[in-house]
């Protein structure tokens, strides 16, 4: 970034553009504001004067490019006239914060509103995920002589510090807000108006959500008004917020008055108008263009969304207006599932982000352009944007009338000004290309201006962008200061198209050159335009794709192959809904596997050791892809640390090998061992155990030259597990945590002495599997029995409630944590030990029945099961027992307790005991027309996996006090973060392998359906091990199998809780394509 004016007062620093726009605000390395801004963006930190005229309110920003700006060593001044007001604002800095001295004159009633966005964490943390950091900022509001004061504390430690800021005023504050959604409103995407600033009063409520922004409202002034807003920052506030700091007036009086030196005022070459929003589309247009609509979603008689026969998802603008989480899509090219590290991916958003975060391979590093940092489209330079220029006014294309997306393309339809403008972004199958095309249906000529914020790395502004322009073609290279250069030196992106001119920010204003990282492509007026970018990771660019329509068919067909040609038929619409789900969740499994990132969680790029061992592995297990499973096993084991036998929590699976998180939770070491048993049972590939693969050197984070057989890797890991058993037991130490990341121990004493009952159950299951399939099975059988014996001794000997944790301090009596007798946490029940102990067959029938009684009574809610019977106690964000569970100020994601991954494991446990409600439980977490199943479900995007179902409590205190409303279904539940999760893969695994019960071993097909009787006659097509199978499920008094009209002799598999699965030897299938009727037992439940 260039041209910044930095003001520094000891540890506090702020950077401005000469025209007065704030770039960033820091206390040491703590970024106080949320986004590093450029002068072309709407400013998040702002002061508005609001004219109250009758019933209407007119709002005017004071800190704008129209102001006359001056600087001195203490701050910046803004002066000017806006609407009916004359104003001056002086921003003064001191060593701990800032003051805004505001004076406004105007012949009417008005008030002032100050907006301050917050990052309140180390810069790298804030820029990794603004929404995540917002979830951990606690707001504390006090009311005193000057009205309301808002304190904000970062509850997640930043290098052992808890930064805080106090925002207030020296005059009366009568209203406030704590989250940007309470100011802008979801409709901002369509109107560009801050909806709640048009209301007489701010909401004056603490809303702990994902857009950290404090807003303050003054009392009304008549004709003349003065106020002083302030921000007072603290580097470390270990305790929860309490009484506010009072000596602000004294601090203010110590700032010396100095004249301001006038600064350069940026002169815009073009007027930037309000964005274009598509008009409401007509029913006749929809009927003509989308006559066949599947799973229509309606509200109050209006159509909101639907799917096409080809499974594309189509959304109306009216739905987008209501969502906090904007409609988005992660587009993929045709993924090479054996070599996923070169996948081309891009993110699109309905609100007019046509191509953002375009990556070739690594989603953090090999990134061509920037990603969206705000869900409301307030920041409009991210990624690739398109303006229409009319009479020297530039208008951005925003929310369309209709948006359509598939797995490799998105299309925006703008009904506007008597025309239909179509924008389409398409990724090609194999040639690493992205096309953006614009077309006018009426043949109208438009002058288009396309902006692209180039990063050639993780973040905008971080690295130099190196490019070469020749004959209108722009080629982008890794620069000398880029980490790409030594890892993927051949990486390039090449751009061409029908543009006439390539320029930069000077197209908007010459003073903005170098401020935003924009390339600006100007097109001559035409009724169509094309923009094309191609990536390469090796020496040569691929041959370009010519036929995009044929390309789309190739990619669509690849999903049929990926899902083993899976298809359901039934007279009800449930089959149709699940066919759609299989298609979209297969795509989202591929995102998790091949291009790890999400819509909200835009950073990623790595495989979590436990995550890849679940979502992708279980998907490929369910669909029978032995080659990918084998490669996955060897890849995961090659990342094992040679000295400890453990794994990193996560690692990059491409050439950025050294980037990984060394410390891992106590269960992580178990997952690679678990997949060994699963793979060997399915494949019979005992030869894999003799494959020689490297380790990772924990110091250098590189592969070792020395190799060990897979079996040696396995044995090393098992030795490590044994070494970590609590003294005198076969119970694994909790270490840094288990699957529930929010329950990491808060101190070293807990870490040392805790045992997770869930990890113990998983370990037992894994040892049992190894005993069945490894050469020295007796050893693992003995280990399993020892684990089972100690589980019974310590966990269930004197109670019928499995505790969430055991506290086992040497020399003291064992203590149950998360248990009805636990008076420390006051949490009674924990879900995942109850489900995993059944899945693993660790507990007997009586205990299994008790587990499900507990779940039904205490953990099951209308939108699914919750992780605990009560939330962890929250007291301002200070940890006592657990880290994030007691730190998160937002009641969402795992902290909100309905984490969908765990609900899917509940489905697995239901299938284990033969409970036919498993099918309904699949429906409860399906986003397609979810309100038909969960009446209190809030609207959400219908084609994306949501990782949690979040009860719409404003903050943790309301959640604690009113948690019973979740069970009642009397509070709305919102969809959480989307797409990036192991959830889509395990959902499809449970659908196919547990609920439909279709599994295989090396020499047999296994059928174990757990279906309600209303699905009698359900048909399923699937291809396993080169056998195309046409299956029909029929309920019966006894289970049996009929193949091509002939009843088969079958055996039952083992199941501790009920009659086991039907086993059909593959040798009995005499024809390649078989018609198989599975008669499933009506009453086969524990």
Curated annotation (Swiss-Prot):
Active site residues per record: 741
- What Gene3D superfamilies does the entry give? 1.50.10.10
State the source organism's domain of life: Bacteria
Q: Which GO biological process categories is it annotated with?
A: carbohydrate metabolic process
- InterPro entries attached to this UniProt entry: 6-hairpin_glycosidase_sf, 6hp_glycosidase-like_sf, GH36_catalytic, GH94_Enzymes, SOGP_2nd, SOGP_C, SOGP_N
Q: How does activity depend on pH?
A: Optimum pH is 7.5-8.0.
Q: Which family does it belong to?
A: Belongs to the glycosyl hydrolase 94 family.
Q: What's the protein here called?
A: 1,2-beta-oligoglucan phosphorylase
């Amino acid at each position: 970034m260039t041209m910044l004016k930095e003001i520094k007062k000891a540890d506090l620093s702020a950077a401005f553009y000469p025209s007065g726009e704030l770039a960033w605000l820091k206390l040491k390395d703590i970024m106080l504001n949320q986004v590093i801004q450029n002068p072309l963006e709407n400013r998040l930190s702002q002061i508005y004067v609001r004219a109250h005229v009758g019933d209407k309110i007119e709002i005017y920003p004071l800190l704008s490019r129209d102001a006359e700006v001056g600087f001195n060593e203490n701050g910046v001044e803004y002066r000017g006239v806006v609407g009916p007001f004359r104003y001056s604002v002086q921003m003064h800095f001191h060593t701990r914060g800032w003051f805004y001295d505001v004076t406004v004159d105007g012949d009417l009633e008005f008030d002032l509103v100050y907006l301050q966005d917050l990052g309140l964490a180390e810069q790298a943390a804030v820029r990794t995920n603004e929404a995540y950091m917002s979830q951990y900022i606690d707001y504390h509001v006090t009311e005193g002589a000057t009205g309301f004061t808002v304190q904000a504390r970062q509850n997640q430690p930043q290098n052992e510090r808890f930064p805080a800021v106090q925002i207030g005023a020296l005059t009366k504050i009568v209203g406030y807000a704590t989250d940007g959604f309470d100011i802008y409103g979801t409709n901002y995407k369509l109107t560009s108006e801050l909806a709640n600033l048009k209301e007489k009063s701010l909401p004056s409520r603490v809303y702990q959500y994902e857009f950290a922004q404090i807003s303050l409202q003054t009392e009304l002034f008549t004709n003349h008004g003065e106020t002083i807003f302030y921000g007072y920052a603290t580097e470390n506030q270990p305790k929860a917020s309490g009484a506010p700091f009072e000596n602000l007036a004294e601090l203010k009086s110590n700032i010396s008055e100095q004249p301001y030196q006038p600064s350069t005022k940026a002169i815009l070459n073009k007027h930037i108008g309000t964005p274009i929003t598509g008009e409401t589309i007509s029913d006749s247009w929809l009927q003509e263009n989308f006559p066949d609509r599947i799973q229509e979603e309606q509200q109050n008689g209006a159509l909101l969304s639907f799917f096409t026969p080809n499974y594309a998802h189509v959304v109306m603008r009216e739905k987008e207006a209501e969502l906090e989480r904007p409609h988005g899509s992660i587009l993929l090219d045709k993924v090479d599932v054996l070599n996923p590290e070169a996948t081309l991916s891009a993110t699109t958003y309905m609100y007019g982000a046509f191509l953002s975060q375009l990556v070739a391979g690594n989603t953090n590093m090999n990134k061509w352009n920037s990603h969206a940092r705000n869900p409301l489209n307030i920041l409009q330079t991210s990624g690739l944007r398109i303006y229409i220029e009319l009479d020297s006014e530039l208008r951005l294309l925003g929310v369309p009338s209709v948006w359509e997306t598939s797995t490799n393309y998105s299309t925006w339809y703008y009904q506007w000004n008597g025309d239909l403008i179509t924008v389409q972004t398409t990724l090609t199958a194999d040639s690493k290309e992205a096309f953006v095309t614009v077309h006018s249906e009426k043949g109208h000529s438009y002058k288009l201006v396309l902006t692209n914020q180039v990063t050639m790395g993780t973040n905008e502004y971080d690295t130099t962008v190196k490019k070469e322009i020749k004959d209108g073609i722009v080629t982008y290279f890794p620069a000398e200061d880029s980490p790409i250069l030594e890892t993927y030196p051949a990486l390039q992106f090449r751009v061409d198209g029908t543009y006439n001119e390539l320029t930069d920010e000077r197209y908007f204003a010459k003073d903005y050159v170098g401020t935003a990282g924009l390339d600006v492509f100007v097109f001559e007026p035409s009724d169509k335009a094309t923009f094309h970018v191609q990536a390469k990771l090796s020496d040569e660019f691929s041959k370009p794709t010519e036929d995009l329509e044929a390309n789309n068919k190739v990619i669509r067909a690849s999903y049929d192959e990926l899902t083993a040609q899976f298809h359901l038929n039934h007279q009800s619409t449930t089959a149709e809904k699940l066919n759609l789900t299989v298609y979209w969740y297969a795509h989202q499994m591929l995102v998790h596997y091949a291009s790890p990132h999400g819509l909200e969680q835009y950073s990623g790029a790595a495989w979590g050791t436990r995550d890849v061992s679940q979502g992708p592995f279980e998907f490929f297990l369910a669909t029978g892809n032995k080659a990918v499973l084998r490669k996955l096993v060897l890849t995961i084991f090659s990342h094992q640390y040679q000295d400890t036998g453990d794994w990193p929590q996560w690692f990059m699976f491409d050439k950025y090998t050294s980037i990984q998180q060394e410390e891992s939770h106590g269960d992580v070491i178990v997952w690679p061992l678990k997949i060994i048993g699963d793979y060997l049972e399915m494949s019979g590939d005992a030869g894999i155990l003799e494959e020689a693969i490297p380790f990772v050197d924990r110091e250098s984070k590189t592969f070792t030259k020395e190799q060990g057989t897979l079996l040696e890797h396995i044995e090393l890991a098992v030795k490590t597990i044994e070494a970590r058993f609590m003294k005198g037991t076969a119970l694994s130490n909790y270490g840094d945590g288990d699957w529930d990341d929010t329950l990491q121990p808060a101190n070293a004493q807990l870490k040392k002495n805790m045992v997770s009952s869930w990890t113990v159950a998983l370990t037992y299951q894994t040892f049992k599997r190894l005993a069945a399939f490894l050469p020295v099975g007796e050893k693992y059988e003995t280990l399993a029995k020892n684990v089972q014996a100690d589980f019974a001794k310590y966990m269930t000997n004197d109670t019928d409630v499995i505790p969430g944790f055991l506290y086992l301090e040497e020399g003291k009596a064992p203590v149950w944590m998360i248990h009805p007798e636990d008076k420390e946490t006051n949490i009674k029940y924990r879900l995942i030990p109850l489900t995993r102990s059944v899945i693993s067959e660790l507990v007997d029938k009586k205990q299994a029945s008790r587990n499900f009684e507990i779940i039904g009574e205490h953990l099951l809610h209308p939108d699914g099961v919750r992780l605990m019977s009560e939330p962890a106690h929250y007291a301002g964000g200070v940890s006592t027992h657990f880290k994030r569970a007691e730190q998160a100020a937002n009641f969402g994601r795992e902290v909100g307790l309905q984490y969908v991954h765990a609900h899917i494991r509940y489905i697995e446990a239901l299938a284990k005991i033969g409970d036919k409600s498993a099918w309904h439980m699949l429906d409860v977490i399906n986003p397609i027309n979810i309100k038909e199943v969960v009446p209190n479900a809030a609207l959400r995007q219908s084609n994306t996996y949501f990782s949690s179902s979040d009860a719409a409590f404003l903050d943790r205190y309301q959640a604690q006090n009113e948690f019973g409303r979740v069970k009642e279904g009397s509070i709305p539940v919102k969809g959480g973060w989307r797409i990036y999760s192991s959830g889509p893969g395990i959902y499809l695994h449970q659908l196919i392998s547990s609920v439909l019960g279709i599994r295989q071993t090396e020499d047999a097909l296994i059928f174990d359906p757990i279906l309600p009787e209303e699905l009698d006659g359900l048909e399923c097509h699937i291809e396993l091990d080169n056998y195309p199978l046409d299956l029909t499920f029929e309920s019966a008094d006894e289970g049996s199998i009929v193949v091509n009209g002939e009843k088969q002799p079958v055996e039952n598999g083992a199941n501790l809780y009920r009659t086991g699965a039907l086993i059909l030897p593959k040798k009995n299938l005499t024809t390649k394509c078989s018609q198989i009727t599975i008669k499933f037992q009506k009453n086969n439940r524990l």
